[in-house]
Curated annotation (Swiss-Prot):
Species per Swiss-Prot/TrEMBL record: Californiconus californicus
Domain of life: Eukaryota
Annotated keywords: Disulfide bond, Neurotoxin, Secreted, Signal, Toxin
Name assigned to this protein: Conotoxin Cl9.5
Main location, first listed in the record: secreted
GO MF annotation: an example: toxin activity
Amino acid sequence: MNCYLILTVALLLTSAMTGTTTAGQLNTKGVTLREDDRTFPCSSGLCACLPLDSYSYICLSPSSSTANCENDECISEDDW
């Protein structure tokens, strides 16, 4: 068996057993670890919506419906 495969499996098992995540996996807030949750994810003038069926923010116009957003809200840059 290839030693790289063994090492990869060992690292994955260690990660799974300790509850740690690798870059790109989701944290409890729904923002991927590649995104800094202190940095507003949208362009100026838009608001950030966390869809009910997703873990990544989408950017909406402030006048858009928030019915599909968590807590029925779209967060502005000022409120981020």
